[in-house]
């Protein structure tokens, strides 16, 4: 038998480190009924050496654990599970790893079998590189804007280099979500700053914060220069095809704009949260507003917006291309 541990490992706000209480609870419960033949596989994201601390608390030998980090994306999780880019297995017990590998024998992708620490690092460094790539595009966006270049043409020309690629290579208000921010914090926490200098990795979050400020300032400047009556941010979640508001760039931009612009609203057709006040603000627009597309949205939303814009000559509309 194989037991998968798939519990959250959020960031503890007070200590700014990984919170292992859910993982500890799950491991403890499994340990109470454990037998030597049971393959315990941790899919939860956990920094190197933290699992040893958890196992010590519950009286379990950490060397008996196997690891199988998940790489599912919100909005495409089912497809990602059945069609993964790769499967990573980690551990020191070869017999348990063999059983785990047999479970995935029907999957058409490379299976990487490695040690526990390496399997954990693969997940963390993947979630470090992706926001690094997004931050590069956003910094490039600011440089292109400053230089007066054509944003779409420049990014396409760079991305067509097959060493770079166009996937995950578009500008955004900033990046967010439930994984990238916390994983980057944890990466920067599990190495000794006195012994290891990682200037690139240690500044990714700062780059993102700077870009969020830049986004807000550009929206504000455009709003003021055109003497508009309000701003409509289109898309509330942290990315398209999800309703997850955690660490949403839209939320951050909204807060920054709200301090100086009275009429700032967020338009979203996917979010269904009882804590959000809903009203047909868009249908009642009769004064000049700035529409900002925070990320690509579905055709239905764009068709509705285009109809509203057609019916009003006083609306300024910009896709994400500040």
Predicted segment positions?
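Structural/interface elements that position substrates and couple domains in central-metabolism enzymes
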Residues: 1-322
